[in-house]
Amino acid sequence: EVVAVDDGSTDGTGEHLEEFAERSAIAVTVIRQANSGGPSGPRNVGLDKARGRYVFFLDADDHLGPEALERMVAMADEHGTDVVLGKVVGVNRTAPKSMWDKTLPRTDVFSSRIKFTLSAQKLFRRDLLTRHDMHFDESLKTGEDALFTMEAYLRADGVSVIADYDCYYLVGREDGKHATKSGGYRLRFDSARALMGLIAEHVPAGKRRDGLMVRPFLITLLPQFGPVFLKDDEEVRRDKLALAKPMIDAYWTEGVADRLKVNERLRVNLAGLGRADLLADVLVFLKKKKAPALHVDPRSRKAYLAYPHFRDKEAPIPDGWFVPTSRETVTIDSFKFAPPRAPERAFGLIPRGGAPAPCVPSGGRSAYRGSDRRART
């Protein structure tokens, strides 16, 4: 079946849908209503009218691959999963990529990268949604799909990922006026707050929660303290810091921080301290697109990325904020710095030629002795 909701279109969409319904070989329900101001309302209307075993939310700008629904339903039926992600490709716009490395017949939100795709364009088992009375939050003007999809991931009995077939074509509008790009900065904080609260409600404090909290901190909150922050006036800066502080106080942990790059961790920490001045200095440095100096302590052999205010006696910033983690890859002079993917903080320096090389501190002495070629952190 197709349930098409015309949310107050003024371009003849309603008439086109009704004409399509008359000649369609499958059941088509057309609902015409006044414009609701966002996607949540029409999605909820369509969801309540749906009667199939599965539902899929298709946005007006986009389209499906010819075999998309067939393949996704078959995947869910074969493996008994409640949510299926079909590979998304961008048309005149970018699309998420990191979760499409390989097809996963059965996974979950904790052991995959699906937390980085929270749009509503997934196949959902309708029984999952009705059993938990799941609907889109119409009070949110942005990020409502992230809240809905994350809840589905957390409640699902398994999630499947189809990576070997282009299921969904995410089409960029020529005018750039996508609903998800509208609204002021306060709406982004509303979205981050709601998503963090949902995760905290469903997942006890610990490594699993920290792993999920990376998503709202990195994708929703942190952009507010990116390049746009330098353009904000003082009043907006103060407001953003005030909005962020309760979330940082409640959900920002060392476990979340250790999963972010140094510059990301610095920005969140400085926002939590309310230090717009120090944050601006870091952003000015990032704007120059230069790699930070690599500082290796000659005594402890600990390594740091020396962003602005590293060991600045006038700034209350601990050295630990500057320690690189496994997400960090920085090219420094003739070296490519790439910490191993390990839980502990450790890294090596590998020159472009491939042979191990020492870390040399400012004093000029090798940072390792004998055969130990790793600067320990």
Locations of regions flagged by a protein language model:
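Short, solvent-exposed segments of well-ordered alpha helices
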Residues: 186, 212, 333-336
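Nucleotide-sugar donor-binding/catalytic module of glycosyltransferases
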Residues: 1-191, 229, 340, 346-347
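All-alpha amphipathic helical-bundle segments outside canonical DNA-binding/catalytic cores
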Residues: 206-214
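Generic structural hydrophobic/aromatic packing signal, biased to beta-strands
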Residues: 61, 84, 124, 170, ...
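Basic, ligand-binding patches in group-transfer machinery
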Residues: 230-377
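Solvent-exposed aromatic/hydrophobic patches embedded in short alpha-helical segments
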Residues: 51, 123-124, 213-226
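Catalytic core of nucleotide-sugar-dependent glycosyltransferases
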Residues: 165-173, 179-207, 220-224, 230-251
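A short, terminal or domain-edge coil/loop segment
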Residues: 85-88, 136-147, 194-198, 217-228, ...
